[in-house]
């Protein structure tokens, strides 16, 4: 049974945290709080709740992390805040810039690093955000999964990626231009294995006092943690993308191992339930399908995929696979991708081949790795799997 805190429980926990911070001189990171939680925080300080609205605007519109610069907040309150609170986002450890304009940042989270990718285009600027240090799902074609898993990111470490990127590019409150128009939870980790922190972070993204993004411009991508997906619609409404990658259970069991627990039918039934109550998806889910040469890219696979998706309103993104060291796969040829796309289009599906961005700096889909202290022994397991695939393909 998936356990989640209600808003009231979270607010109560926030209050307890504030008391703990005051008593033990341990400062609370305000980036861990939604605006509603921050209003509770100010009430506990004996202040008017509207101060939270002012503070959220300073933090996210203006990228401000120094209380002394918040000039519409009186000095007495600023001094009080400095005693009990802080505003702290991950720092950039490494920045890499691609020839196509893509930027990848390795963000320092404790003694490890996660990766965040900024993808500018003519009509939008998308930020790809990580939700975990590593990933426990062990998808065989993904570089992140080969690093193993260490821990979930906190709310501040998730929303802090957006904050740090916005500060580098130019905050809305300073430039008058949104530095980021879209956020995709498609970085390192499985977001639905960290809903307790991912959902509040997305709430901040949607909050008009913070980033004010449309719910259609915040996308959560999942490999299919069905109980959490069923719970998600009760917590927040955002755009949904499904990392499907295979048209049958036998193949998906192998390349997306969570399928052994929640098979394709269970997943698609859950997707349809989500779509039935969501306003963020224009009635359609995005299906992500990585193209692996002679693994899942045959015409027969396209026909099978069409049958899987026939009762689910969707658009399909075909993703050319991006190689990483020691991977046991090859990239599908353009001709195989084209044939796969045309086969699906004959069924009436909208099918897009995703343009690869940032592959020269290992920032493309499936290439994010970061610096992870593995707690899952995945690094050792991947060597054995690679040897098995090599023998099978020989």
From Swiss-Prot:
Domain named Radical SAM core is located at: 121-360
Q: Please, one GO biological process term?
A: rRNA base methylation
Does rRNA processing appear among the keywords? Answer: yes
Q: Which residues form the active site?
A: 115 (proton acceptor), 365 (s-methylcysteine intermediate)
The answer, when asked if Endoplasmic reticulum is one of the entry's keywords, is no
Q: For S-adenosyl-L-methionine, which residues are the binding ones?
A: 189-190, 221, 243-245, 322
Among Pfam families, the record links this protein to: Radical_SAM, RlmN_N
User: Where does this protein reside within or beyond the cell?
Assistant: Cytoplasm
> So what does this thing catalyse?
adenosine(2503) in 23S rRNA + 2 reduced [2Fe-2S]-[ferredoxin] + 2 S-adenosyl-L-methionine = 2-methyladenosine(2503) in 23S rRNA + 5'-deoxyadenosine + L-methionine + 2 oxidized [2Fe-2S]-[ferredoxin] + S-adenosyl-L-homocysteine; adenosine(37) in tRNA + 2 reduced [2Fe-2S]-[ferredoxin] + 2 S-adenosyl-L-methionine = 2-methyladenosine(37) in tRNA + 5'-deoxyadenosine + L-methionine + 2 oxidized [2Fe-2S]-[ferredoxin] + S-adenosyl-L-homocysteine
Keywords assigned by UniProt, alphabetized = 4Fe-4S, Cytoplasm, Disulfide bond, Iron, Iron-sulfur, Metal-binding, Methyltransferase, rRNA processing, S-adenosyl-L-methionine, Transferase, tRNA processing
Q: What else is known?
A: Reaction proceeds by a ping-pong mechanism involving intermediate methylation of a conserved cysteine residue.
Q: What does this protein do?
A: Specifically methylates position 2 of adenine 2503 in 23S rRNA and position 2 of adenine 37 in tRNAs. m2A2503 modification seems to play a crucial role in the proofreading step occurring at the peptidyl transferase center and thus would serve to optimize ribosomal fidelity.
Entry protein name: Dual-specificity RNA methyltransferase RlmN
Species of the source: Pasteurella multocida (strain Pm70)
Please spell out the taxonomic lineage of the organism that makes this protein: Bacteria, Pseudomonadati, Pseudomonadota, Gammaproteobacteria, Pasteurellales
């Amino acid at each position: 049974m998936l356990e989640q805190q209600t808003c009231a429980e979270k607010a109560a926990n926030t209050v307890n945290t504030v008391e703990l911070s005051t008593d033990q001189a341990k400062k609370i990171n305000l980036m861990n709080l939604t605006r509603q939680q921050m209003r509770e925080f100010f009430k506990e300080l004996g202040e008017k709740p509207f101060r939270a609205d002012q503070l959220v605007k300073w933090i996210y519109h203006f990228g401000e992390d120094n209380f002394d610069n918040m000039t519409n907040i009186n000095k007495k309150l600023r001094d009080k805040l400095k005693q009990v609170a802080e505003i702290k986002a991950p720092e950039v450890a490494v920045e890499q810039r691609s020839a196509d304009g893509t930027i990848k940042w390795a963000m320092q989270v404790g003694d490890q690093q996660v990766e965040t990718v900024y993808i500018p285009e003519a009509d939008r600027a998308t930020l790809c955000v990580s939700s975990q240090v590593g990933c426990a799902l062990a998808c065989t074609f993904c570089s992140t999964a080969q690093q193993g898993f260490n821990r979930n990111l906190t709310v501040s470490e998730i929303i802090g990626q957006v904050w740090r990127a916005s500060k580098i590019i130019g905050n809305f409150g300073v430039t008058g231009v949104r530095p980021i128009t879209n956020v995709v939870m498609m970085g390192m980790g499985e977001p639905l294995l960290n809903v307790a922190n991912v959902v509040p972070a997305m709430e901040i993204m949607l909050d008009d006092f913070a980033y004010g993004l449309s719910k259609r411009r915040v996308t959560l991508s999942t490999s299919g943690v069905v109980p959490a997906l069923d719970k998600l619609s009760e917590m927040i409404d955002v755009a949904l993308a499904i990392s499907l990658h295979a048209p049958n259970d036998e193949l998906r069991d192998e390349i997306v191992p969570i399928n052994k627990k929640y098979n394709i039918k269970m997943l698609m039934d859950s997707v349809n339930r989500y779509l039935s109550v969501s306003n963020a998806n224009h009635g359609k889910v995005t299906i992500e399908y990585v193209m692996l040469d002679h693994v899942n890219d045959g015409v027969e696979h396209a026909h099978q995929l069409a049958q899987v998706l026939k009762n689910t309103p969707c658009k399909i993104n075909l993703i050319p696979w991006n190689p990483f060291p020691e991977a046991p796969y090859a990239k599908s040829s353009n001709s195989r991708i084209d044939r796969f796309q045309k086969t699906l289009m004959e069924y009436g599906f909208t099918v897009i081949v995703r343009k690869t961005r940032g592959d020269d700096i290992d920032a493309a889909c499936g290439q994010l790795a970061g610096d992870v202290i593995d707690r899952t022994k995945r690094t050792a397991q991947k060597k054995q799997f690679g040897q098995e695939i090599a023998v099978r393909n020989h």
